[in-house]
Each structure stands twice: as C-alpha cells, then as structure tokens.
Amino acid sequence: MNILILSSGTRNKIVQYAKQTFGMDGYIVATDSSKYAPSLYDADKYYIVPRIDHPQYLNIVLKICRDEKIDIVFSLIDPELELIAENINKFESIGVTPIVSPLKWVKIAFDKMQMHNFCVENSINTIKSFDSLEKVKNEIATKKINYPLFAKPKSGSASKNIMKIENEEQLDSYCKNQKDYIIQEYMDGVEIGCDVYIDSISGEVVDIFTKKKLLMRSGETDKAISFKDNKLFDFIKKFISKSGYKYNIDIDVYVKNGEYLLSEVNPRFGGGYPHAYECGCNFFDYIKTNINKEKNEAKVGHYNENIVMMKYPEICIKEMG
C-alpha cells in the first residue's frame, strides 16, 4: 500500500511509524507547503505543494494520488480535515481511502459549542460552556459558576487566542475583541490525553491509550505518563457509541470531583500519539487491517502504566540548492 501524508510539518515520527507498517509492500509520500518541513525527508518521496487555501490545492493532491498510485491519504493538521471529508467521494473514485471521520463529525469537533451541546444532549459529562456574554453573566449572578473562567475561540487549534479570565473587566474585554468565542468554567485539575482507534467496519472501539499530561507546549503534549482506568475507558466508549467518529482520533479529558469531563476532540493523530505507539498501540496496523476490509479485534488497556514520554528537540540537516 502507498500512503500519502498531507501537511506533515514536523511530525517526523508519524512518517517513520507509517513506513514501519507499510514500507515493506509500499512507500510513503509526504507533502507540505514548505521545503523546510523536516518530516518530508523521512518519507520515500515528497512534494512541495501550495497552502491548503489555494484554489487548486485539492486538484494538486488528487493528481499526486493518481501519479503515485496512492491507496491511503490522511492529514496531520486540523484545517485540512474538513477539506478531505468534504471530498471523500473524489478520493474514493480514484481508488484512494481517506483516513478521516465523516464530515458531520469533523465539523462538530471543530465547533466547540456544537461539541458541548452534543455531549449535554447525550448525557456525556463535559465542561460548562457558553457562547454569549449574557449567558455567562447570568450564570455568575446566580453563582452557578465563578471566576476564574476560561475563554477561547469557538473554533481553532494550537491554543491560539486563549485566556484565563479573572474578573468582569477581562471578560468584557475578551468578548468585545473576539468575534466567535466560548467561555468555560476554568479547569485546573489533571488533563488527560486519549488516543482512540475506532474500527471503520464495525464502528467499535479497538484501542484506547490514556496519559496524564505533565507539560504542554503550543497546545501539544510535551511530557506525559501513561495510566489506565476502566471508568475512563467506559466513558470514552460511551462517547464513541453516541457519535460517528472512525479511525484514529484524539480526545482531551479533564477530571473534576472524581468525574471525567470531555473537553475536546481532534479527529486526527494527536501530537502525543508517539507515546501510544511506543507503548504498543500501533494504529497503523489497525488502519491496514481495515483497508484490507477486515475488522480489528478490541484490545483496550493492553499497554503498561507509568511509561513517561518526554519530547526533546531534534534537527534535520539537508543540502539544498
């Protein structure tokens, strides 16, 4: 099988892991808009492409798929997931399987208020969230929530334009300067990252890897430690059973008063996925099984606890003309 990894950026490990699974009977092609994306040089072949908002971007990607006889395509950045999901039929018509959830669920994942409402409607614990200043102030006045609060864009990634709100003056200022926002209760407890694989044939959860985040950097997990809790596994399975996600997704969860609360869902490989892979949760094997039209057997909780992941800088040296 030949794999196309879009917008690979600095995700060298993902390219390397894909090669370990698919490299024996296929090859890995990577793309990015910059020749200075180091992951390109871990692939068997690479293309420098326009940014994803270029009017010909999709046609360029489809041409690469045809020219390279690509079997599987996936992206590593949020803004591109919706583009792929919108055009699944175009990929499938040339024999390419996009590893992405259905468009409806990609859109819900990237609209934090929609995700909040979905969780509330399906009795899934989630963080209290509001999309209007009036609603927030009413909750404060009735003492249902208190300062500090947490503000962030309704859609977005990489922890951009987020703010801890300490008082009414900061609240008013943030809401005045941000067009689409949500205000949430502030969570200062343990944040947990969950790498989840959902079988694309059966719709069942195949694997879950959970880690407590020890340090974050630019919205990605920098240091974390693995752990297991059947209560958390059941919480995630309930969410998946109510939703329509498939393949690999990344879920962020908080703990409050002994209960798990869903925070966000990213329908792609999360920045902390290498932790899961190195602990034996090989989602590329699961993808390969599904592409071969076979179901994966569930193996939730098969990894070891107390395994720490610590990211560190690495360099790529290339001669360029």
What is each of the regions a protein language model found here?
Residues 1-99:
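ATP-binding N-terminal substructure of ATP-dependent carboxylate-amine bond-forming enzymes
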Residues 1-29, 68-69, 200-202, 206, ...:
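Preference for protein termini
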Residues 4-5, 72-75, 127-128, 182-185, ...:
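Short catalytic-loop micro-motif centered on adjacent basic/acidic residues
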Residues 38-41, 56-59, 107-111, 159-162, ...:
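Short, charged, surface-exposed secondary-structure boundary motifs
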Residues 106-188, 200-202, 230-233:
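Active-site nucleotide/adenylate-binding loops and adjacent lid/helix of ATP-dependent enzymes
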Residues 184-244, 248, 266-293, 301, ...:
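ATP-dependent carboxylate/phosphate-activation module, predominantly the ATP-grasp catalytic core
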Residues 246-257:
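A short glycine-rich, hydrophobically flanked beta-strand micro-motif that places a catalytic Asp/Glu
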